[in-house]
């Protein structure tokens, strides 16, 4: 299955997908340190090569990936949801990015969606 990894972080979910036999075709991650880890894991062979979208997820267009992606995965920011966070929930600035994940899922229309997040959700 071809995966589009949103909020990819340092690639733990991508590695899990690789173990399941998924092929990541693109990752979206704004954090520079996380992107550096993704590149390092590609360079050392832990992860297969894939392009990394480094701009804000609000600028990512999922439509070109329609028909090319079987699963959209990701864990949108949970700081506003978790018990250690602000308590503003899905309306919070960071956790509100769930709506971008929803938008991209609608653009891509994958067969499957895999979301990881706080149990407080």
Residue positions per predicted region:
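Conserved active-site and SAM-binding loop architecture
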Residues: 1-121
